């Protein structure tokens, strides 16, 4: 997890429109996925709470916590991941049998609370880990170590598979279909497991109002092009597209959080942003970043896996969610008074305005 600025080197490309003048933005919303890949938007906003500690824990300190959490763990090596965020200290511990373990320790009070909720959710999800319900693995907390500052560090063994490579997604059965089925299986989980974990639960109208509030707040910065504000407000005020059944959503899906082996999804990580909300949120990153010829296969497999599925405006809300990620990136920069983030968000919003000029999210 990193709150660093997303790279801005994605190539430009043309806008593709359908017969209803709706747009499928290939770029710069590819960069929206890059924002998400840094885990910077939702996590940075949700984790900016009081700091529990003033010094980042070293990998060796985290390895020591792992030996407390998992008695008998024989540490052979310890590494810090390449992506390190501001909410958690994270280390990879390799034991004498060459097994890999992850150690996470919260840095802020809010991160500590989120970690506890995530653990509760993961424990509840264990009963659904089978081919009929969840056909992939999720982290299984193996042990805990109490922190002197308060809260707990959690240790879990690494899951099989490698991070999803979006360029491997293609049309037809295979990995794209597996991704679609995996997302659908999340959205078929009972809402009670999220509610019982103390994570947020929204109805459709409340969630629409939250999105409107985000747009209003972004508008007050004076840095969002007027045409984008009109585009977003038009979609948000079209109540027809907001008639959906809220589902369990992962809330922080990125390529790094989806593990694959061959043509199958083997695991999904990073559940601390889970909630009951709009299923379109989990599709946004794929709609803007997956190869265009793979999207139909993803959505077909997704639709077939859902039960009693009727949501004709799902992809429209997904594209909107991807665009609004840029507004949240801007707001994060404003709140933290980070001029580099603000400038980056403004540049991406300008690109988005150029590529969506005259196009509609909804007809």
Name each model-derived stretch:
Residues 2-19:
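Low-acidity, Ser/Thr- and Arg-rich intrinsically disordered low-complexity segments
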Residues 85-95, 102-103, 234-281:
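Active-site acidic catalytic loop and adjacent metal/ATP-binding pocket
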Residues 25-77:
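Juxta-kinase regulatory segment immediately upstream of eukaryotic protein kinase catalytic domains
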Residues 12, 22-23, 50, 107, ...:
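ATP/Mg2+ or Mg2+-diphosphate-binding catalytic cores
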Residues 79-198:
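ATP-binding pocket architecture of kinase catalytic cores
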Residues 280-310, 320-338:
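Active-site activation/catalytic loop segments of kinase-like enzymes and analogous catalytic loops
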Residues 147, 153-169, 188, 212-218, ...:
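A glycine-centered beta->alpha junction motif in the catalytic cores
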Residues 57-74, 191-250:
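An alpha-helical support segment within catalytic cores of ATP-dependent transferases
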């Amino acid at each position: 997890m990193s709150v660093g600025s997303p790279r801005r080197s994605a190539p430009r490309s043309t806008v593709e429109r359908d017969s209803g003048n709706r747009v499928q933005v290939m770029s710069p919303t590819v960069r929206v996925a890059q924002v998400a890949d840094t885990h910077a938007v939702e996590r940075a906003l949700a984790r900016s709470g009081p700091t529990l500690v003033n010094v980042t824990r070293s990998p060796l300190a985290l390895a020591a916590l792992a030996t407390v959490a998992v008695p008998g763990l024989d540490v052979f090596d310890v590494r810090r991941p390449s992506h390190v965020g501001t909410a958690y200290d994270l280390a990879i511990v390799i034991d004498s049998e060459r097994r890999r373990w992850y150690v996470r320790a919260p840095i802020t009070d809010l991160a500590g609370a989120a970690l506890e909720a995530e653990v509760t959710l993961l424990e509840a999800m264990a009963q659904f880990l089978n081919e009929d319900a969840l056909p992939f693995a999720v982290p299984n907390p193996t042990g805990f170590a109490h922190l002197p500052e308060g809260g707990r560090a959690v240790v879990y063994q690494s899951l099989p598979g490698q991070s999803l490579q979006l360029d491997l997604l293609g049309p037809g059965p295979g990995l794209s279909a597996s991704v679609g089925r995996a997302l659908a299986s999340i959205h078929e989980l009972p809402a009670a497991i999220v509610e019982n974990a103390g994570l947020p639960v929204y109805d459709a109208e409340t969630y629409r109002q939250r999105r409107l509030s985000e747009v209003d707040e972004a508008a007050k910065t004076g840095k969002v092009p007027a045409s984008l504000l009109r585009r977003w407000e038009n979609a948000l005020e079209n109540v027809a597209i907001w008639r959906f059944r809220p589902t369990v959503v992962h809330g922080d899906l990125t390529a790094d959080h989806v593990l694959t082996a061959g043509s199958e999804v083997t695991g999904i990580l990073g559940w601390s942003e889970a909630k009951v909300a709009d299923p379109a949120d989990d599709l946004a990153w794929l709609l803007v970043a997956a190869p265009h010829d793979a999207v139909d296969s993803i959505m077909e497999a997704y639709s077939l896996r859902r039960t009693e599925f009727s949501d004709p405006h799902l992809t429209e809300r997904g594209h909107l969610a991807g665009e609004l990620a840029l507004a949240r990136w801007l707001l994060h920069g404003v709140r933290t008074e980070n001029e580099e983030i603000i400038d980056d968000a403004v540049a991406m919003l300008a690109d988005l305005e150029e590529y969506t000029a005259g196009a509609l999210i909804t007809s």
